[in-house]
Swiss-Prot record:
Gene assigned in the entry: arpp19-b
Record note on quaternary structure: Interacts (when phosphorylated at Ser-67) with ppp2r2d.
One cellular component (GO) term of this entry: cytoplasm
Domain of life where this protein originates: Eukaryota
Alphabetical list of InterPro entries matching this protein: Endosulphine
Single GO term (MF): protein phosphatase regulator activity
Phosphothreonine modification, residue list: 99
Protein's name in the database: cAMP-regulated phosphoprotein 19-B
Record flagged with keyword Heme: no
Keywords on record: Cell cycle, Cell division, Cytoplasm, Mitosis, Phosphoprotein, Protein phosphatase inhibitor
Amino acid sequence: MSRDNQEIKAPEESSAEEQKEMDDKVTSPEKAEEIKLKSRYPNIGPKPGGSDFLRKRLQKGQKYFDSGDYNMAKAKMKNKQLPTAAPDKTEVTGDHIPTPQDLPQRKPSLVASKLAG
C-alpha cells in the first residue's frame, strides 16, 4: 500500500510542477512586455507622491467639500470682521423657565389683521 500512496503522490506533484511552469510561461511574456515598456517610457508609472493632479490640488490650499462648507467659512470670516455688540442687553436665555409675569408685553402689530375685520 505504501507504494500505491507514493505512486499516487508522484502524479500530483508533477501536475503541480507543470501548473507552475504553465503559470510562469503565461506571466513571463507579460512581464517581458512590462520590462520593454518601462525601458521605453521610464517616466510613466506609479509615482510615490500620487498623481500630478492630486499634488496640484493639494498645493492650492484649503478647498471646500461643497457650497455649504464654503458659505459657512465665508460667514465665519464675516463674523470675525464685525464689531461685537455692546453688552447692554441683559436677556437671559435658558437659565430659568419663563412665567407669564416674566414675559414682556406684546407690541401691537402695525399691519391690520384681515381676520379682525
